[in-house]
Amino acid sequence: MNFTKIFVLIAMAALLLVGQSEAGGLKKLGKKLEGAGKRVFNAAEKALPVVAGAKALGK
């Protein structure tokens, strides 16, 4: 039982230390996700007033 907890902690520490060298790829992925999030937010920002107006007309 304790072995699994210790193993998980060691594995997490190893991933954090090794993951530092892979920051370039992760940064690119993060930028892509951020851009997609911005596009979704902007589209929702434009569409929500239209949807709210259509609901008000339907009442």
Curated annotation (Swiss-Prot):
UniProt function note: Cecropins have lytic and antibacterial activity against several Gram-positive and Gram-negative bacteria.
UniProt-annotated location(s): Secreted
Major site of localization recorded for this protein: secreted
Record keyword Cytoplasm present: no
Pfam families: Cecropin
Organism name: Aedes albopictus (Asian tiger mosquito)
GO terms classed as biological process: antibacterial humoral response; defense response to Gram-negative bacterium; defense response to Gram-positive bacterium; innate immune response
Database matches in PANTHER family: CECROPIN-A1-RELATED
Name recorded for this polypeptide: Cecropin-C type 1
InterPro entries linked: Cecropin, Cecropin_insect
Signal peptide interval: 1-23
Induction: By bacterial infection.
GO CC aspect terms: extracellular space
Family to which this protein belongs: Belongs to the cecropin family.
Keywords: Antibiotic, Antimicrobial, Immunity, Innate immunity, Secreted, Signal
